[in-house]
């Protein structure tokens, strides 16, 4: 769609007026496309040092998501450090919460939840963007580790993940040095495929879909048995929010049992969870759901979701 709009302009179409609805839409499309291409390497408030995975293309984004510097890794790291030393990029101190999106999404998909968290928590709420189609879960976990390492003055760090974002956090936890892990406070998992994904297993049986899988999607579709062994169970307090109807059937006719249209309730299970909550919401709508938003705040503050929490499923799904 973005390409079509640009081609139309190049062939004499009426230019898009700045600030118009069309310009706003084009900007959203551009940011969505870039979210599939660039991964954060350092995040300080809304300043970002980013890399295009698999290349030596680096850049710095300011709080308006405008690109202020491009170049190789050394040049961009040096400029980011200069901006920090000059006080343009302030340090993150005290409590921090890092929010992660899911597969094929970008930071914008988490904004409804992020906005709510920022209005309610006495913490710096950051978003971690990663190019899910361009790199595997190992690479995304390593990138998250560099983001955490870039926050040395954050005394406690909590995580909120949606879908694949939870697996990225768990992969980082498997790799993380002890000093970083000691700063981890709590984690909220939203629609997490902790036991893999039946939808991914279905895709693996269709050779065309399997062949088209790239990056983190390939890990879910083809490499799950291996990947699952490299994901840590969080040592911190963590709670799980699952979407479902509570009727044993769920939103999808393709999936067995209750589900959120993408992830089965049973697939969200992970031993050691401090609390579990079933919410009547689809996978893609979790971030906008007021019950999910309030439960997330409650867990980050108290270690419990509050209200009536459903019992966790007794067993993970069959492989």
Model-derived regions, located:
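Short catalytic/ligand-binding loop motif for oxyanion handling, primarily in non-cytosolic enzymes
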Residues: 106, 196-198, 247-250
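Flexible, membrane-associating and regulatory peripheral segments of lipid-active enzymes
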Residues: 6-97, 106-111, 115-126, 148-150, ...
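Serine-dependent carboxylesterase/thioesterase catalytic core
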Residues: 97-103, 118, 123-235
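Short amphipathic alpha-helical segments
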Residues: 110-112, 171-173, 201-202, 252-254
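Residues that form or flank phosphate/diphosphate-binding pockets in enzymes
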Residues: 108, 135, 287
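C-terminal catalytic-base region of ester-bond hydrolases, centering on the histidine
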Residues: 19-23, 233-319
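Sec-dependent N-terminal signal peptides
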Residues: 1-3
């Amino acid at each position: 769609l973005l390409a079509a709009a640009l081609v139309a302009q190049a062939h004499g179409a009426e230019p898009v007026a700045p600030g118009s609805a069309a310009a706003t839409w084009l900007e959203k499309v551009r940011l969505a496309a870039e979210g599939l291409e660039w991964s954060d390497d350092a995040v300080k408030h809304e300043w970002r040092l980013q890399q295009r995975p698999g290349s030596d293309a680096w850049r710095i984004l300011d709080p308006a998501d405008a690109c202020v510097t491009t170049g190789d890794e050394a040049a961009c790291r040096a400029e980011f450090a200069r901006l920090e030393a000059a006080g343009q990029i302030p340090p993150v101190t005290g409590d921090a919460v890092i929010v992660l999106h899911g597969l094929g999404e970008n930071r914008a998909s988490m904004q409804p939840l992020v906005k709510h968290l920022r209005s309610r928590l006495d913490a710096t709420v950051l978003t971690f963007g990663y190019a899910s189609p361009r790199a595997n879960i190992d690479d995304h976990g390593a990138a998250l580790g560099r983001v955490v390492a870039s926050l040395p003055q954050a005394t406690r760090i909590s995580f909120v993940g949606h879908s694949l974002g939870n697996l990225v956090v768990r992969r980082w936890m498997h790799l993380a040095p002890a000093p970083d892990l000691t700063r981890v406070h709590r984690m909220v998992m939203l629609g997490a495929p902790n036991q893999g994904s039946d939808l991914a297993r279905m895709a693996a049986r269709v050779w065309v879909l399997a062949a088209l899988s790239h990056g983190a999607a390939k890990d879910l579709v083809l490499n799950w048995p291996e990947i699952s062994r490299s994901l840590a169970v969080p040592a911190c307090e963590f709670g799980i929010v699952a979407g479902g109807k509570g009727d044993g059937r769920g939103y999808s006719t393709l999936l067995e049992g209750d589900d959120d249209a993408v992830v089965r309730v049973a697939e969200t299970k992970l031993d050691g969870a401090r609390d579990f909550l079933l919410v009547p919401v689809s996978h893609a709508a979790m971030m906008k759901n007021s019950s999910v938003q309030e439960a997330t705040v409650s867990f980050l503050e108290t270690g419990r979701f509050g209200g009536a929490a459903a019992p966790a499923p007794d067993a993970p799904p069959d492989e």
